[in-house]
Every structure is written in C-alpha cells, then in structure tokens.
Amino acid sequence: MPKKIHPTWYPEAKVICNGELVMTVGSTKPEIHVEVWSGNHPFYTGTQKMIDTEGRVDRFLRKYKMGDKSSKKADQK
C-alpha cells in the first residue's frame, strides 16, 4: 500500500472572512478564505429580505401562454 498519500491535516485551520478570523476548523488547508459565513449571512442574522416572485410567475405564464385556464383540448371535446 502506498505511503504518504493522504494530505496534511490541520486541526486548527483558520476560517477568514473579510480579513477577520471567524472560526477554526479541521481542514487540509491551513487557512480558508470565505466571502459568506453564518455570522454575516442574511438568513442567519435575521435581515433576510422577502423576494416578490409573483411577477416572475406571471411573466413565465405569459411567455409560455399558460395563463388562461381553458385549453384548446378541453374546447375540442
């Protein structure tokens, strides 16, 4: 069996977000740079914005002509 095939394990790897140390984890890299983590993500901080998707659905229905309830197959019967 080949020896030394596993990467080096860093049990105290630093997770850095915006130049600030946010936590330590175990990793195969000594430093991990992230843009978003649970401390600044809107879902976890309670600053989540609700997105109005009704306009998107209406646009989809118009685009594929699914907006009307009566279909041609139903009229032919």
UniProtKB/Swiss-Prot annotation:
Q: Which PROSITE patterns match?
A: RIBOSOMAL_L31 (PS01143)
Q: Which UniProt keywords apply?
A: Ribonucleoprotein, Ribosomal protein, RNA-binding, rRNA-binding
Q: What does this protein do?
A: Binds the 23S rRNA.
Similarity section = Belongs to the bacterial ribosomal protein bL31 family. Type A subfamily.
Gene Ontology MF terms: rRNA binding; structural constituent of ribosome
Gene Ontology biological-process entries: translation
Q: Which NCBIfam families match?
A: L31, PRK00528.1
What is the protein's name according to its record? Answer: Large ribosomal subunit protein bL31
Protein's gene = rpmE
Q: What InterPro entries does the database record attribute to this sequence?
A: Ribosomal_bL28/bL31-like_sf, Ribosomal_bL31, Ribosomal_bL31_A, Ribosomal_bL31_sf
The family database entries (Pfam families) matched by this protein are listed as: Ribosomal_L31
> Which cysteines are cross-linked by disulfides?
none
* A single cellular component GO annotation: ribosome
Give the record's subunit note.
Part of the 50S ribosomal subunit.
